[in-house]
Design a protein with these regions (language model features):
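An exposed, glycine/acidic-rich loop-and-rim segment of catalytic or binding clefts
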Residues: 1-192
Length: 192
């Protein structure tokens, strides 16, 4: 497995945003970025054997910094909406950031999609990790999260999320990739 990483842009506060390419021996590859622990490219063979990117996304990493659709992002602390931006655990009510009407969506403005994650190479992929302190976005508990992306010689990608916290809290992580199985530049209505 060949893994390449390079800095492509910086956040407004100067943190480097990197692109990681994980390529197998057939030339198929996956790309990720530490901005939101995102999966940004899935270049795999089509039925004729030609490589095609089947993920919908942006042309540059700078575009992901402005993304409002969570393209390829690791979403958390809580994927989906929490009604009225609040919940109760053990008779204590927690008030969250409001970012979707009266609700909290995908962890609010402080969600995992809007963070620069730490990273390390794995033999067959990339591990991203993030620390979210107690009270961030209104959520209780210090939490350490990991997202592993592993790619194999059969062109299979495994995505695994792990979380560890020091108190009762809500956690519901997911990956928010969008697919066009026809490949870039083709109409999604041509899926077969």
């Amino acid at each position: 497995m060949k893994i390449i990483h390079k800095i492509e842009t910086y956040t407004s506060d100067g943190k480097p945003v990197l692109r990681f390419t994980v390529m197998n021996s057939s030339g198929a590859y996956m790309e990720f970025t530490n901005w939101g622990a995102r999966w940004i490219t899935a270049s795999v063979p089509d039925v004729q054997g030609a490589l095609a990117n089947i993920l919908i996304g942006y042309d540059t990493l700078s575009d992901y910094l402005k993304d409002s659709y969570y393209m390829g992002a690791t979403v958390g602390r809580f994927a989906n909406r929490i009604a009225d931006a609040s919940f109760t655990i053990d008779r204590k009510t927690f008030h969250l950031e409001v970012n979707d009407g009266n609700n909290t969506n995908h962890g609010g403005f402080s969600g995992f999609h809007n963070k620069v994650w730490q990273w390390e190479e794995l033999p067959d992929g990339i591990r991203f990790s993030l620390y979210s302190p107690d009270g961030e976005g209104g959520f209780p508990g210090n939490i350490h999260v990991i997202t592993d992306y592993r790619f194999n010689e059969d062109n299979e990608l495994s995505v695994r999320h792990y979380a560890e916290t020091d108190c009762a809290t809500y956690i519901n992580m997911t990956n928010h990739a969008y697919f066009n199985l026809c490949g870039n530049g083709k109409k999604i209505t041509e899926h077969r």
